Amino acid sequence: MASSTTPVSFLAPPLEQLRHLAEELRSLLPRVRVGEAQETAEEFNREMFWRRLNEAAMKVSGEATVLTTLFSKIPSPSPQETQRICEQVHIATEEVIAAYYTFPKDQGITLRKLVRNAVLDIVDGTAQLLDALLAAPSQSPENGDLISCNSVSVACQQVAEIPKDNKAAALLMLTKSVDLVKDAHEEMEQAVEECDPYCGLLDDSEDNSDSHHNEDGVGLPSNRDSYWSEEDQALITPCLALVRASRASLKKIRILVAENGRKDQVAQLDDIVDISDEISPSVDDLVLSVYPPVCHLTVRITSAKLVSVLIKALEITKASHVSPQPGDSWIPLLINAVDHCMDRIKELTQRAVEL
């Protein structure tokens, strides 16, 4: 009599299952970055969306905690236990992504980017947690595991902090831009104050001029690449004024959006944020270009790029609903100030262009 045996499905070892899950989660990231909304605006329910997204995020956080705890206990989890928790983590992560896909673009590109970035942080954070569990010795929870688990929890908790409309999202992004440009402006001012190579030397004893011309050049910079020449210092003045104008422009734009921005004007708010986002990187490029050794042609190029972005940002703001008074003079004044700075920079860098 032939005996029948029930086939037993083969399960990979626990660590191999974790490695496979980490790969699966990372394969989802490109899909999230380019994914389109799956619902029309008519089907979108704002309150239901935020509730669903937050609940899905909290589920991922809970599963991440269970996963970390399971691999911190003795004995180590069986292949069956590992399969079960891996499936739960995968399902929870897919639910977060599915919730994101229900957020339509016409609710605001700025807000949608914030939601997308939050989801990416959750998915990537979970994959990093799996990496940490794979790297740690079996049955020996390391600080890295706990940190990774906490990072997942923090990413999940941040979902509740996401602005709930595009105006609030725009203000958040503009505030970040203002802060970044403020930091760059203060850094540049501090560099100008502290990088005078002759500070405290020429003023100490004018009569003892020979002390500044000894054989070793004691007290004087020996490398001209480490300090500003007189020509550099003259060029820095309009560059600093241009950075100052950038900071003032962003602050003014943020104030206008805060005071006059309308939640239903999502496209105009997105346009303002998009162009304003370009200001900080352009400021950074200019600030970096004025550090010694200074290439005057590079300063001219980075200045022109910043001026182009600034004027475009001011013009887009002026043409939008956040500027209810066409006769408001501050935008033309800022544009004139920016143009004046650029004219001066062109004048001071003309020799570099002609070489």
UniProtKB/Swiss-Prot annotation:
N-acetylalanine sites (modified residues): 2
Keyword Transmembrane helix part of the UniProt annotation: no
Ranges where the record places region Required for interaction with CCND1: 2-205
A cellular component term, taken from the record's GO annotations: nucleus
UniProt induction comment: Expression is induced by partial hepatectomy.
Keyword field contains Phosphoprotein: yes
Region (Interaction with RPLP0): 2-187, 235-355
Segments traversing the membrane: none
Swiss-Prot/TrEMBL keywords: Acetylation, Cell cycle, Cytoplasm, Nucleus, Phosphoprotein
Any one Pfam family match given in the protein's UniProt record, by short name: GCIP_N
Region (Interaction with TCF3), start-end ranges: 2-181, 147-355
Region (Disordered), start-end ranges: 203-224
Predominant localisation class: cytoplasm
Localisation per UniProt entry: Cytoplasm; Nucleus
Functional note: May negatively regulate cell cycle progression. May act at least in part via inhibition of the cyclin-D1/CDK4 complex, thereby preventing phosphorylation of RB1 and blocking E2F-dependent transcription.
Family statement: Belongs to the CCNDBP1 family.
Alphabetized PANTHER family for the sequence: CYCLIN D1-BINDING PROTEIN 1, CYCLIN-D1-BINDING PROTEIN 1
Name of the protein in its database record: Cyclin-D1-binding protein 1
Upper taxonomic lineage: Eukaryota, Metazoa, Chordata, Craniata, Vertebrata
